[in-house]
Amino acid sequence: MEMDLNNRLTEDETLEQAYDIFLELAADNLDPADIILFNLQFEERGGAELFDPSEEWLSHVDYDLNPDFFSEVVIGLAEKDGDEITDVFARVLLCREKDHKLCHILWRE
């Protein structure tokens, strides 16, 4: 898979795309109680954080997770606004290269 460093989503675009995908698929993958909790608390303590892909993804996908092209977005709730997310609802792996639409999600269980 050939990728172009000059054809990547920005960090903000990556966060936005991951969050849009999360919202679209959450109803089919989260418990109704979790969806209610997330919706009620997101404005005060919710967030999406961008990371390099964690090693855990290697057991779920079979390609090189070069951090130049792949990002992990953690979506969930923090204890308070500005804190690190501790209550994770989804971890989204996205390819940032615009011509390679790859996405995998690990949902809260």
From Swiss-Prot:
Give start-end ranges for the coiled-coil region(s): none
Q: Which Gene3D superfamilies match?
A: dsDNA mimic, putative
Record HAMAP family: Put_dsDNA_mimic
Say what the protein does. Answer: May act as a double-stranded DNA (dsDNA) mimic. Probably regulates the activity of a dsDNA-binding protein.
Q: Which family does it belong to?
A: Belongs to the putative dsDNA mimic protein family.
Name of the protein in its database record: Putative double-stranded DNA mimic protein ESA_01547
Which organism was this protein described from? Cronobacter sakazakii (strain ATCC BAA-894)
The root-end lineage is:
Bacteria, Pseudomonadati, Pseudomonadota, Gammaproteobacteria, Enterobacterales
